[in-house]
Amino acid sequence: MGLEDEQRMLTGSGDPKEEEEEEEELVDPLTTVREQCEQLEKCVKARERLELCDERVSSRSQTEEDCTEELLDFLHARDHCVAHKLFNSLK
């Protein structure tokens, strides 16, 4: 085993384009499952309520209202769906 072989082992194949292609192929399954779950009816309705709240709060200059409850409802609905689907896609 020569010095060149050791360098290839430490840095990979040595071809930066090849390394970039390998990195681009990796997709986080959590992101994919979240996107799928956000399309479900329950999540769509929760997101609509969140967006309506955001519009209402943003249109007022002085308000004590925030959209914490709507945000938590949306995240809960999405994460409930994700919890049931994510572990099936993991190896």
From Swiss-Prot:
Belongs to the UQCRH/QCR6 family. It comes from Bos taurus (Bovine). Disulfide bonds join 37-81, 53-67. Residues 1-13 form a transit peptide. Component of the ubiquinol-cytochrome c oxidoreductase (cytochrome b-c1 complex, complex III, CIII), a multisubunit enzyme composed of 11 subunits. The complex is composed of 3 respiratory subunits cytochrome b, cytochrome c1 and Rieske protein UQCRFS1, 2 core protein subunits UQCRC1/QCR1 and UQCRC2/QCR2, and 6 low-molecular weight protein subunits UQCRH/QCR6, UQCRB/QCR7, UQCRQ/QCR8, UQCR10/QCR9, UQCR11/QCR10 and subunit 9, the cleavage product of Rieske protein UQCRFS1. It comes from the Eukaryota. Keywords: Acetylation, Disulfide bond, Electron transport, Membrane, Mitochondrion, Mitochondrion inner membrane, Respiratory chain, Transit peptide, Transport. Component of the ubiquinol-cytochrome c oxidoreductase, a multisubunit transmembrane complex that is part of the mitochondrial electron transport chain which drives oxidative phosphorylation. Residues 17-27 have a biased composition (Acidic residues). SUPFAM superfamilies: Non-heme 11 kDa protein of cytochrome bc1 complex (Ubiquinol-cytochrome c reductase). Residues 1-30 are annotated as: Disordered. It holds the Pfam family UCR_hinge. The keyword Glycoprotein does not apply. It is a peripheral membrane protein. It is found in: Mitochondrion inner membrane. The modification N6-acetyllysine is found at residues 42, 85. InterPro entries: Cyt_b-c1_6, Ubol_cytC_Rdtase_hinge_dom, Ubol_cytC_Rdtase_hinge_dom_sf. One of its GO terms (biological process) is mitochondrial electron transport, ubiquinol to cytochrome c. This is Cytochrome b-c1 complex subunit 6, mitochondrial. GO terms for cellular component: mitochondrial inner membrane; respiratory chain complex III.
